[in-house]
Amino acid sequence: MDEREKAVRLWFSMWLEKKDLGIRRLFSPNCVYVESWGPEYHGAESIRLWFEEWNTRGTVLKWDIRQFFHKGNQTVVEWFFQNQMNDGRAEVFEGMTLAAFDANGQICFLKEFGCNLNRYNPYCGGLKPQFSNEQARWF
């Protein structure tokens, strides 16, 4: 479990430092990586390409780990994330990562889930829900 937590911490630190500190060692050659909003990458080389390209367009400001859960070969990480894109857009949200590890200790599957920070009770004013005018975000 400790090795898996180190692997996740390494992955997050790569984003914070904008530096490949061993993507090909961290992810298996056949790894599948699913972002919460739709993109899917196949293989460590594809993940490395995405990492390098994304970091030309933005900066991860925070990726704080809140807690880990472990079961079998899987690890779940709860986190807080913040970025700033070069075009002025910024994102702040909470999320979770489900990661599976192979027999070599490499990540062979990773799926991210995001959660909007702007939460509210649509029934606080009565039986008819009042939903926010904010456009739904899919993290």
Which residues fall in each region the model found?
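Intrinsic disorder/low-complexity signal
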Residues: 1-2, 19, 34, 77, ...
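A solvent-exposed, acidic/Ser-Thr-rich amphipathic alpha-helical stretch
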Residues: 3, 20-72
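Hydrophobic pocket/interface hotspot
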Residues: 11, 23-24, 31, 43, ...
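A beta-strand edge to alpha-helix "cap/lid" segment located at domain peripheries
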Residues: 52-139
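Alpha-helix C-capping/helix-to-loop hinge sites
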Residues: 11-14, 34, 83
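Short, low-complexity N-terminal intrinsically disordered segments enriched in polar/charged residues
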Residues: 1-29, 130-139
